[in-house]
Amino acid sequence: MKNCPKKSAYPKIGIMKRPHVLLTLFVIFISLTSYSQFRKYSNEFLNIGAGARGLSMGGAQVASVQDGTSGYWNPAGLVGVKNNPELNLMHAEYFAGIGKYDFASIAFPTTNNKRTFAITGLRFAVDDIMNTLFLVEPDGSINYNNIQAFSSADYAFIFSLAQKLKESGNKNIHLGVNAKVIHRSVGKFAKAWGFGLDAGIQIYQGKWKFGIAGRDITTTFNTWSFTFTEKEKEILYLTNNEIPVKSSELTAPRLVVGVARDFKISKKVNLLAEANVDLTFDGKRNTLISADPVSADPKLGLECNINNIFYVRAGINNFQKALADGDTLNIKKVWIYQPSAGAGFKISNVTIDYAFTNLANQSNPLFTHVFSLKLDMVGDKNKKKK
């Protein structure tokens, strides 16, 4: 870290006039921190996604997203929320209802539509986990009445600000930043608090759209604390379990680069194609391009827009190697991927989106149905104008 640029150099750079400088600074930072020790899968609930539109397009959203879900995908896209506040809601259940995932966001554009503020909330929880610490009585007998249930829940609260840097007839540049607070709890036993920053930029030129999102750009940290009664500590000690006191974990920076293009199919039909690449800097991962310290995970998405009323979407992501089915020797590996599809329907100021996603390999899939709602909160004056 001795070779990091001095802080005094930052104010001299015209960031508002040169958005690409943000990317340069971020790349320098992650190259210097990539050799630090991070937990590779820290805060994984933040990688599930937000909104059925994004999930049905395989998570390829960084370049094209322009609604209230941008606080999750790329905060720069929040400038697409104009004139009225926008509310987004989503609920999904995973693994036969064991895991429940909720997303909510509300975005507020300023009167001149140059800035947008947004608040986003995420929750992933698993309920009714059995606590069997006291299942066995001191005399060795089993007492099922001693089993108690608890929940494990992860929360994230994201505060976003987006601003238009440049708007002309052929080129638009938007910038956005996130500050996120993370809270995680495992029953009454463990709790964690964390904080992190994200930043993103979008550049629209003609039919082309470019996006870059830096997540956890300063490294996101979680600090854990643990609480056990004396009786619980005794049971843990007698069963040769370690009794944790305090711990902390860091989430390494992640860079998502995206490019999208609009295609005019007919007078009422448009096609949007987008490709994203997730770049991680915490060592070798099981991805399409796997290296140390940088791994790359591509995502592809398509959206067919019919008269701005009906939408059909498809996507593919999560390319990785897995053991082949039927290989009893566990030697042969094959490439698998995660497909997704979905649709959307817009009526006036209400949009309902649906996603059908696959959570496992093709031979033994686990499918999830996801619905989300987008509401443009049009005021009475605007309704009368319409």
Locations of regions flagged by a protein language model:
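Subset of outer-membrane beta-barrel
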Residues: Q37-K386
